[in-house]
Amino acid sequence: MEKVKRLDYVDVCKWLGISLVIFGHMKMPGEVLQWIYAFHMPLFFVLSGYTYRAQRIDKEFLMKKIKTIYVPFLLFALIFCRGEMSSWAYIAYGSRNALDIAGTYTVLWFLPCFFAAVILFALCMNIIKGKKWLLLVEVALLLVGAVVCDYLKGAQPMIAKYGYPFNFDMALIGAVFMVAGYYFKQIIEWFNSKKQLLLIATVVVLFAITSYTAFINLPESLNPACPHVEMSVGAFGNWGLFFMNALLMSFALIGLSVLFDKWVGKKKLVLFIGQNSLTILCVHGTILLAASKVLPKIGLTGVGDGALILQGVVAYVIVIVMSIPVILLIKRFVPNLVGK
């Protein structure tokens, strides 16, 4: 199979995305978390659709996705779980609720969800066979499916308790974001080739819009444990605002990444982080836990907004610095852990 050249600005965008994931799992001012959670997980689905290339759904395709997405999920989930045999079935089920019951790292919900979304999106692309209007019909069906799943979750106690296997309800939403990413590429490439000043203006305007709209969309129930929208638990608030914020900010961040790639010469570390975002997703929680023990010992305490942001920046640096040797060791000795 012909190897596709990586787009540096996509790796820049993955760096931005995984950085937001890290900050999103810290104690930060509520406004910061509300803004981050408005779009940071949809961004990764958008980027997947953005980099899509035509391929048949055959054994080779499925085995590659199992190796690069599902196997890393299983291995990391088993590493972080309590080690009880009963945990294995919950991990294989793959929902966020089941991972919580298994006592493993719930942020891993994204991987089985992403795996299912990739398959759904590939099915959509294989069905349309060049008839792009059919893709809009498929998007409508995906959204209807997501609404039905959301209704059943509220009506069926078992679904409410365990969630859907592979977070299938969120995978339907993820596939919609992938479709958006597929169309975004044509627009971004047009901006990139001819209209850089217009791209700058567009990015600024989109940031301005979502700096307001991200704060007016709250989940239906203001649960103190989830005071903001959150894709992992299906807390969307107003669905229209959720999709608008996620799509506009994803487009803005891709545009910002294009500009960053053009303007910044030395960015090896940024590209390295973006290219290894999967590993960082899987290990950053453990490093953050260690960092939370270190920060008070170096005098970084306090609960004010400024103090929390400073602690967050220092913790972020610790995560990146400690992730680098972990990434290199995994690549050298256990590449299968990250699907290599």
Label every PLM stretch briefly.
Residues 1-340:
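Alpha-helical transmembrane segments and their immediate juxtamembrane cytosolic regions
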